[in-house]
Amino acid sequence: SALTNAFEFDEWALIEEAVTGREIEVAVLGNENPRASVPGEIVPSHEFYDYEDKYIGDGAQLLVPAPLSESEVAEVQQLALKIYRTLRSDGMARVDFFYEKGGRGFLCNEINTIPGFTPISMYPKLWQASGLSYSQLLDELIELAIARHTKRRNKT
């Protein structure tokens, strides 16, 4: 039924497996030597984490840091860094995972190369919990941008 509906709008449709699991996010910061924040968890108040959960009222609970074991924290941080490096990312990104404790573990959902930066956004909250204040985060992002620009300028 959903596939039939999709084909009413286009001749192509992307089909993905539904994944049930916890939503875990890791902030990554850096150019050549990136580092990962403590992970956070989004606990939606509804079945899906939608626009209303994200932006209206108390739609979701943000757990920072996420309630994970030390080994789970290390694993998801290493996965976030591997994804960040594999995609040759610079500056910042937030890597989002589903955590299926029943067998498959951490599954990458997406990478956000321009993560939210509002007072309710996870990215600055993760760095705050990792010991980096909002102003320090901004300073570091500016330094990373200057370093990237200088490196590119010197290549030509």
Feature map (PLM): residue ranges:
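Conserved metal-phosphate-binding beta-hairpin within the catalytic cores
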Residues: 17, 27-28, 84-117, 127
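Glycine-rich phosphate-binding loop of ATP-grasp-fold ATP-dependent ligases
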Residues: 1-4, 23-25
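Cysteine/selenocysteine-centered motifs that mediate thiol-based redox chemistry or coordinate metal-sulfur cofactors
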Residues: 137-156
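A long amphipathic alpha-helix within ATP-dependent nucleotide-binding catalytic cores
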Residues: 3-13, 55-101, 149, 153-155
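ATP-grasp fold ATP-binding core
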Residues: 10-20, 24
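Mobile, glycine-enriched helix-loop/loop "lid" segments at the mouths of ligand-binding/catalytic clefts
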Residues: 34-58
